A protein has these predicted regions:
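Membrane-embedded alpha-helical signal segments
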Residues: 1-274
Length: 274
């Protein structure tokens, strides 16, 4: 019986092929918990240039490693003139159907209708009316019931982290905060194992993006980093490593990602079972 038990343990229990010692360096007296880059200004106002806004958002949200940040550049047509635009939102916190059908489609397709052609001296031409881009988009192209104009990136970040999306338009020095919140999964319930009297009563569920959205709502800052990867040979299970930039120890983060990358298992059932 013991031999059979040991055989099962070898089949289903992970044992590292080599042992190593990991030592976390202690901080000295002169070290700081948070090192903010000098170029980062929390109250920076939105630029008129879309390229500057795009680059600022990419740095602010670390889009190269943050897996749940959606940045969608596109072109919209206003009265015969094309403008570059940028949509920014968080996967798991926005309603994709609402965004596709009632935000991106009106902006990208509805206003493509050709202007009425006129003829003068035998030459056809299109009469283009000069409009205020900011007011035109706000009044005619955004059908959502809750749309706000924000002028600072701190306001943009707060809106995005709460489940709204941000819309940037080239030549316009404000951003539109649009309510497109939406969740589609099992309802979030109180935790069964970790019961607390104070603090949040929300428990994690089976869907990864719902869990990351819970963290985004509780930790309302762009400094929250969510890196996604897969674990498992037979079944690639999606996982996410979440930490606070400039606060979490970089050596510890690297060690966690190293161990996950070298985890030799077929399937991850839960956080305690492989």
């Amino acid at each position: 019986m013991n031999k059979f038990t040991n055989f099962l343990k070898k089949c289903f229990t992970y044992t590292p092929t080599k042992k190593y010692n990991f030592v976390l360096e202690e901080n000295n007296a002169n070290s700081k918990d948070v090192d903010l880059p000098a170029s980062f200004l929390p109250d920076q106002e939105v630029f008129q240039s879309l390229d500057k806004n795009y680059n600022y958002i990419k740095v602010q949200y670390n889009s190269l490693i943050n897996s749940d940040i959606i940045m969608r550049p596109f072109t919209l047509n206003i009265c015969g003139k094309k403008y570059s635009a940028l949509f920014v939102g968080i996967d798991g916190m926005i309603d994709s159907e609402l965004v596709n059908n009632f935000l991106l489609r009106p902006l990208m397709e509805t206003n493509r209708l050709a202007r009425k052609k006129r003829t003068q001296n035998g030459i056809e031409y299109k009469k283009i009316k000069k409009v205020n881009v900011e007011d035109y988009i706000f009044d005619k192209l955004l059908p959502q019931n809750s749309v706000q104009k924000v002028s600072k990136f701190s306001e943009v970040a707060s809106a995005i982290n709460s489940g709204n999306c941000a819309l940037f338009i080239d030549t316009v020095n404000i951003a539109f905060s649009i309510d497109v919140k939406g969740f589609s999964s099992r309802g979030i319930d109180t935790p069964k194992n970790e019961i607390v009297v104070r603090g949040s009563q929300e428990a994690f569920v089976e869907k990864l993006r719902t869990n990351t959205s819970i963290l985004r709502r509780l930790i309302n800052t762009p400094d929250l980093i969510i890196e996604s990867s897969t674990v498992g040979r037979a079944n690639k299970t999606q996982i996410a490593v979440c930490y606070m930039k400039n606060i979490a120890n970089s050596s510890l983060i690297s060690e966690v990602k190293y161990r996950l990358a070298n985890l030799d298992v077929d399937y991850v059932i839960s956080s305690r079972k492989c």
